[in-house]
Amino acid sequence: MPKICQITKKKSMLGQNRSHAMNATKKKFSLNIQYHTFWLPEKKKKIRIRITKKGIRMINKFGISKIYKKYII
């Protein structure tokens, strides 16, 4: 399964490590993805989401019901 946040739709990105001599090596910047379980009161069930830490903060700010309706996970 690809590392994509189900809320923010962010993916890993590619870049470069640079040494002091400015030699470049390829690097993959990965996301802080975690599985998280939320309780949906209107559906009366738990949902398990693969989500980044930023997505968890969005849910804490706006509420799981509003995010669920907007993004329909």
Curated annotation (Swiss-Prot):
InterPro entries: Ribosomal_bL28 (IPR026569), Ribosomal_bL28/bL31-like_sf (IPR034704), Ribosomal_bL28_bact-type (IPR001383), Ribosomal_bL28_sf (IPR037147). GO terms for cellular component: ribonucleoprotein complex; ribosome. GO terms for molecular function: structural constituent of ribosome. One of its GO terms (biological process) is translation. Keywords: Ribonucleoprotein, Ribosomal protein. Signal peptide: none annotated. Belongs to the bacterial ribosomal protein bL28 family. This is Large ribosomal subunit protein bL28. It comes from Buchnera aphidicola subsp. Cinara cedri (strain Cc).
